[in-house]
Swiss-Prot record:
Molecular function, one GO term: cobyrinic acid a,c-diamide synthase activity
Gene transcribed to yield this protein: cbiA
Keyword flag Ligase: yes
Record domain GATase cobBQ-type: where: 247-435
Catalytic activity: cob(II)yrinate + 2 L-glutamine + 2 ATP + 2 H2O = cob(II)yrinate a,c diamide + 2 L-glutamate + 2 ADP + 2 phosphate + 2 H(+); Ni-sirohydrochlorin + 2 L-glutamine + 2 ATP + 2 H2O = Ni-sirohydrochlorin a,c-diamide + 2 L-glutamate + 2 ADP + 2 phosphate + 2 H(+)
Positions marked as site (Increases nucleophilicity of active site Cys): H427
The organism of origin for this protein: Methanothermobacter thermautotrophicus (strain ATCC 29096 / DSM 1053 / JCM 10044 / NBRC 100330 / Delta H) (Methanobacterium thermoautotrophicum)
Biological processes per GO annotation: cobalamin biosynthetic process; methanogenesis
Catalytic-site annotation from UniProt: C329 (nucleophile)
Pathway note: Cofactor biosynthesis; adenosylcobalamin biosynthesis; cob(II)yrinate a,c-diamide from sirohydrochlorin (anaerobic route): step 10/10
Enzyme class, broadest EC rank: ligase
Entry keyword set: ATP-binding, Cobalamin biosynthesis, Glutamine amidotransferase, Ligase, Magnesium, Methanogenesis, Nucleotide-binding
Protein name: Cobyrinate a,c-diamide synthase
EC number: 6.3.5.11, 6.3.5.12
CDD domains reported for this sequence: CobB_N, GATase1_CobB
Length: 447
C-alpha cells in the first residue's frame, strides 16, 4: 500500500495534511517518506509515526535506487502503508520541461497513486480545471484523489467537490477548513525542526484529529491499495568497502540535526559504530576515530556553542592530532573561527557570517579534484546546498571539490580541507555520493 500526497504548488498545506494523515493512520503501520532533499518535514513525519522518515529524490537517485530506498525502508519498519509527501508542485523539478527532481518522477518510479492537494480558497469550478490540467499533463501520473484545503465552510466544500467530481471524474476525499491551528511555524531554511518544538507533539496530535474528521481515510486506504507490486530493477544505495571497525562521533542536538538516515546506516554498513554527542551539552568529544558534524542551525545556538569552551577545545585537539572531521553546512560553520563574531572551533581560520539573503540554494554536482576524506580524485557526486551564510577570506584555501552545478564556498570551489578534516556547504546523501561511507570509514581507520 502506498500513496503520494502531492500539491499544486508550495504552501498549499502538504506538510500539515501529510503529517496529520500519517498521525491518524500511525496505529496501522505507516512508513513516511519525503520527496526532495528537505530535512525538516521528515522530522514531523518521524514524530507522527514513530518511524524514521526517508527522503526519496530523483536527482540524488536513479529510478532503481528509488525503488530500493522505498522497499528497503518499508521492510526495515515493517509497515503496511508507505505515505510519501511531495515537494513543491507535483511537476516541479530542476528543468521546466523535465522530470528530474519532481514528485511526479517519484510517483512514476514507484507506480504509486497520487492524491492532489489544492488550496481551494476562492475556487469552485476552477478547482476542476486545475485537476484536469494536472491529470492531462502526464498520463503516466495516476491522480486518483483530491483533497481540498482552505475550505471556507461546508457549502463551499460541497460545491467545489461537486465541480471536481462531476467535471473530472476524480474523487474528492476530503476538505480541510481554514484554521490557524493547521499551520506550521517557518524559519529561513523552511519549517522549524520538530526537535526544537516542545509543543510539536500536541500540535501533530491536533493535525491527526483534524484529518480523521475531515478526510475519508477509508477512501484514502482504498487508493493506497490500488497500487500493485513494485516492479523494475533495484540498485544498491551505497558502496560497501570497509570492514575494519571504527567509531564515528556524530553531532546531534538542537544545533545539529540535519542528517539523512541512510548516511548513518551507510556508515554502520561499513563497520562503523555511530556515537552521538552534543556540541552544546557535552564537555568533550567521546572516544572516537572520526567526527561527523551535519547541518542545522548553529547560528541560532551560536551563544551556547561559544560558551561550551571545553567542547571547542576538544575538537581543536582532535584536529591537531591529525584525526578526521567532516562538517556539512552548519557543521562547516561551526568548524570556522567564528559565526557572526562568536568564537567557534577554529579548525579553519576563516569567519562565517549570516547574511540577509540566500547565498546558495541549488542541487549540486561536484567533482573531487584531490583525494579527501569522503571521495577520491575524479569522483563525481551530487548533493544540495541551502544556506544564508558565507565564509570570508577563504579564496586562498585548499579545496577538494570543483562545483559543476551550484555555488560552493567561493569561486565554484567547495570542500575546504585542513589536515585530515573536510568541510563543505554541500549536503550529500548516501545514494548521491555512494562512495561517502566506504571512504570515510576507511580513512577514519587509517588516520
Amino acid at each position: 500500500m502506498r500513496v503520494v500526497l502531492a500539491g499544486t504548488g508550495s504552501a498549499v498545506g502538504k506538510t500539515t495534511i501529510a503529517t496529520g494523515i500519517m498521525k491518524a493512520l500511525s496505529g496501522r503501520g505507516v512508513q513516511p517518506f519525503k520527496v526532495g532533499p528537505d530535512y525538516i518535514d521528515p522530522s514531523y513525519h518521524t514524530m507522527a509515526t514513530g518511524n524514521t522518515s526517508r527522503n526519496i529524490d530523483s536527482f540524488f537517485m536513479t529510478e532503481a535506487q528509488i525503488r530500493e530506498a522505498f522497499t528497503r525502508a518499508m521492510k526495515l519498519s515493517g509497515s503496511r502503508m508507505g505515505i510519501i509527501e511531495g515537494v513543491r508542485g507535483l511537476y516541479e523539478g530542476i528543468s521546466p520541461i523535465g522530470d528530474t527532481g519532481s514528485t511526479a518522477s517519484v510517483a512514476k518510479a514507484l507506480d504509486a497513486p497520487v492524491v492532489l492537494i489544492i488550496n481551494s480558497r476562492s475556487l469552485v469550478k476552477s478547482a476542476a480545471a486545475m485537476v484536469l490540467g494536472f491529470r492531462s499533463l502526464d498520463r503516466e501520473v495516476k491522480i486518483e484523489g483530491v483533497i481540498l484545503n482552505q475550505v471556507k465552510n461546508r457549502r463551499h466544500y460541497l460545491k467545489t467537490r461537486r465541480a471536481v467530481e462531476e467535471l473530472t471524474g476524480t474523487a474528492v476525499i476530503g476538505g480541510i477548513p481554514r484554521s490557524s491551528e493547521l499551520e506550521v511555524e517557518q524559519r529561513h531554511l523552511g519549517l522549524v525542526p520538530a526537535v526544537e518544538r516542545d509543543t510539536i507533539a500536541a500540535q501533530i496530535e491536533k493535525w491527526g484529529l483534524a484529518m480523521e474528521e475531515y478526510i475519508d481515510l477509508e477512501a484514502l486506504q482504498d487508493i493506497m491499495s490500488s497500487a500493485g507490486k513494485i516492479r523494475g530493477e533495484r540498485q544498491p544505495l551505497w558502496q560497501r568497502g570497509n570492514r575494519k571497525r571504527v567509531r564515528i562521533g556524530v553531532a546531534i542536538d538542537e544545533a545539529f540535526n540535519f542528517y539523512y538516515q541512510e548516511n548513518i546506516e551507510a556508515l554502520e554498513d561499513n563497520a562503523a559504530s555511530v556515537v552521538p554527542f552534543s556540541p552544546i551539552h557535552d564537555e568533550e568529544l567521546p572516544d572516537v576515530d572520526a567526527v561527523y558534524i551535519g547541518g542545522g542551525y548553529p547560528e541560532i545556538f551560536a551563544a551556547e556553542l561559544e560558551s561550551n569552551t571545553s567542547m571547542r577545545k576538544s575538537i581543536q585537539r582532535f584536529h591537531a592530532d591529525g584525526r578526521p572531521i567532516f562538517g556539512e553546512c552548519g557543521g562547516l560553520m561551526y568548524l570556522m573561527s567564528s559565526i557572526d563574531e562568536r568564537e567557534m572551533c577554529g579548525v579553519f581560520p576563516h569567519p562565517a557570517e549570516m547574511t540577509g539573503r540566500v547565498q546558495g540554494l541549488s542541487y549540486v554536482i561536484a567533482e573531487a579534484v584531490m583525494d579527501n576524506l569522503i571521495t577520491e580524485a575524479g569522483d563525481k557526486f551530487r548533493g544540495h546546498e541551502f544556506h544564508y551564510s558565507r565564509v570570508l577570506g577563504a579564496s586562498g584555501g585548499k579545496f577538494a571539490f570543483r562545483v559543476l552545478r551550484g555555488r560552493g564556498i567561493v569561486d565554484s570551489l567547495d570542500g575546504i580541507t585542513s589536515g585530515s578534516s573536510l568541510a563543505s556547504y554541500i549536503h550529500i546523501h548516501a545514494a548521491s555520493c555512494p562512495q561517502f561511507a566506504a571512504n570515510f570509514t576507511r580513512n577514519a581507520w587509517e588516520f
